[in-house]
């Protein structure tokens, strides 16, 4: 059984095959996707049309609009297939269905859904007039064009006036359809994770214990200040952190030390001499507690031993910390986490750290190497309608990775990334009692 990654890869390969006009390969890749979505059937229908097989295209578009009964562009293309098969009544019906799915809007822009095409209401009416011309209904065709002109489409006035002139001369009109080569593409955020990631990297010697090693790229190993102070003791900074709260460490800080290969601390002890070596001003040190939350994708050989697995995980966590979003806990009643997005904001945090054993509390969050902007709490249950959606239940906390537009967010929860309606959630700091689930608005469908 193919994985989600394999299916996305086949989808992408199919798109590339369409770009080079290799119709057979494109159909093969699109057909390999298990349980195809409406988008995939739509792609296959478009390929069949480009390959000159309207019968096969009609079957594919039938599947597409069955899977997604609101796919206006699917009804448009099915109407084109019916027109090419001289099924004029069915073609008119499909164009009427496409117009109905526009729901009074002047256009539907499919760009955000992966198709570089904007379906215009006037184009659907234009196609209806074209079918009426083919049936010899010239008066009806002229009336349909008048309706299209009444919608005042931007940039289409000349096209419609030229079409009206042809109809008056009883010259047939050519159908308008999705441009050749345009199909639904997989979301870019999925494509970024298709290539295998090398978490170990390449080994490189940066120091040698052999004094006579003359390799120009290698420097003799030097004794560090920590070694001179005594290798048996922890670093001054670690001691400073551990000297508070009786030597107890927060789980997030413990994980971050393990991930970076730092020394595993022992019980708290007097560290005055070590602090004198590290800095002349002990007050310049701040106790920082970092809570780390990461979702780490790993590719591990089956049967990997525990030690090797820990090494892989520590390397992956180290990379995640380079990309994670830092936040600090604000003062006040809500105690919300405020993102640290710039160097200036971090310096402002340092200036306002209170002088107390509690010190500074930070949070570092990341999802698949992507920073978390902020968190939201679900006010209602949301069931995923498509693979790119992220479902959740009332009360779930979701990490927001991107604000797609005014109505949609991209988020992460339980190792999964997807998009969801903004109206189903509220910021974590302002969570209120849930209200009845709102009815979806036409503009929120995708």
Swiss-Prot record:
Q: Which SMART domains match?
A: PB1 (SM00666), SH3 (SM00326), TPR (SM00028)
Q: Does the keyword Membrane apply?
A: yes
Domain of life according to the entry: Eukaryota
**UniProt keyword annotation of Cell membrane present:** yes
Q: Where is the composition biased (Polar residues)?
A: 217-232
Q: Which residues form the PB1 domain?
A: 287-367
Q: Which GO terms describe its cellular component?
A: cytoplasm; NADPH oxidase complex
Compartmental location: Cytoplasm; Cell membrane
**In this record, what's one Pfam family?**
SH3_1
The SH3 domain sits at: 371-430
User: What does the record say about tissue specificity?
Assistant: Widely expressed. Detected in gastrum, spleen, uterus, small intestine, colon, inner ear, and brain.
GO MF terms held by the record: enzyme binding; SH3 domain binding; small GTPase binding; superoxide-generating NADPH oxidase activator activity
Query: Main site of residence?
Result: cytoplasm
GO BP annotations of the record are: regulation of hydrogen peroxide metabolic process; regulation of respiratory burst; superoxide anion generation; superoxide metabolic process
CDD domains the record matches: PB1_p51
Disordered: where is this region? 213-232, 252-282
* Database matches in PROSITE patterns: PB1, SH3, TPR, TPR_REGION
UniProt keywords (A-Z) are:
Cell membrane, Cytoplasm, Membrane, Repeat, SH3 domain, TPR repeat
Q: How does it assemble?
A: NOX1, NOXA1, NOXO1, RAC1 and CYBA forms a functional multimeric complex supporting ROS production. Interaction with YWHAZ prevents the interaction of NOXA1 with NOXO1 and RAC1 and its targeting to membranes, hence reducing its ability to activate NOX1. Interacts (via N-terminus) with SH3PXD2A and SH3PXD2B; the interaction is direct. Interacts with RAC1, NCF1 and NOXO1. Interacts with a greater affinity to NOX1 phosphorylated at 'Thr-429'.
| Family assignment from sequence similarity | Belongs to the NCF2/NOXA1 family.
Per its database record, what is this protein's job?
Answer: Functions as an activator of NOX1, a superoxide-producing NADPH oxidase. Functions in the production of reactive oxygen species (ROS) which participate in a variety of biological processes including host defense, hormone biosynthesis, oxygen sensing and signal transduction. May also activate CYBB/gp91phox and NOX3.
Designated name of the protein? NADPH oxidase activator 1
Organism listed in the record? Rattus norvegicus (Rat)
